[in-house]
Design a protein with these regions (language model features):
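Short amphipathic, charge-patterned alpha-helical segments
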Residues: 57-72
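Single conserved hydrophobic/aromatic residue that forms the stacking wall/gate
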Residues: 178-188
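Hydrophobic alpha-helical positions that pack around
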Residues: 1-56, 68
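Ubiquitin system architectures
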Residues: 70, 99-129
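Iron-sulfur (Fe-S) cluster-binding segments and ferredoxin-like electron-carrier domains
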Residues: 145-168, 172-173
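Short acidic, glycine/serine/threonine-rich loops at helix termini
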Residues: 17, 52, 65-66, 89-96, ...
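Local cysteine-cluster metal-coordination motifs and their immediate loop/turn environment
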Residues: 82, 137-156, 181
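Terminal amphipathic helices with adjacent charged low-complexity linkers/tails
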Residues: 72-101
């Protein structure tokens, strides 16, 4: 029952600029609903991976072209993760989505940690999904059944598909597991 202030490095890194220029000026950066700047980590099949502080509001395509210097070997984007491993993925034809909280949410994902992972046209998306699910299965704290059991099942199904033993029913089973776990998990 005591006052608490919780900030992350990203918030604290904005303080010197705000002190020097004012909060009013900072709020002019970005776009309505997503003002200021944000640090995004860009990785995957880009020519220039790294961490970049940008004004909110540009499209993911602009971000990848400007800061990532495009895709390696001039390939096309097959998919990208807009906000870290737990964020729903976007396809390569969704590069025009603006990097704002509302635009990304309205498109069905989240900015989350700001970790943008780009996958080119040669990426096996089943293997990519399995890699992420394996991480979550391994890192699960085990407190809630949907996460503890669900990620293990997702991992097994994706492994079956990746090894060529997948069944058509695996798709509906994957979707069912995802929809069941979403409202019942503890971690939000």
């Amino acid at each position: 029952n005591k006052p608490t202030l919780v900030n992350n490095v990203e918030t604290i890194s904005s303080v010197p600029w705000i002190i020097q220029n004012s909060g009013k000026e900072y709020s002019k950066l970005g776009v309505e609903g997503s003002t200021g700047t944000r640090i995004f980590s860009l990785s995957g099949h880009v020519n220039n991976p790294g961490n970049f502080e940008i004004e909110m509001g540009q499209s993911f395509g602009e971000f990848i072209d400007t800061f990532g210097k495009g895709i390696k070997n001039n390939k096309n984007v097959k998919a990208y993760i807009p906000g870290g491993a737990s964020a729903p993925w976007f396809t390569g034809d969704q590069l025009d989505i603006k990097m704002t909280i509302d635009d990304v949410a309205n498109a069905g994902s989240m900015l989350g940690s700001g970790a943008v992972v780009v996958m080119d046209e040669d990426t096996n998306l089943v293997y990519a999904a399995k890699s992420i699910v394996s991480f979550f299965a391994h890192e699960s704290c085990g407190q809630c059944t949907p996460c503890r059991e669900g990620t293990t099942w997702l991992e097994m199904i994706l492994e079956r598909i990746a090894s060529g033993r997948g069944r058509l029913s695996d798709i509906s089973l994957l979707l069912s597991l995802i929809h069941i776990s979403e409202p019942t998990r503890l971690l939000r």
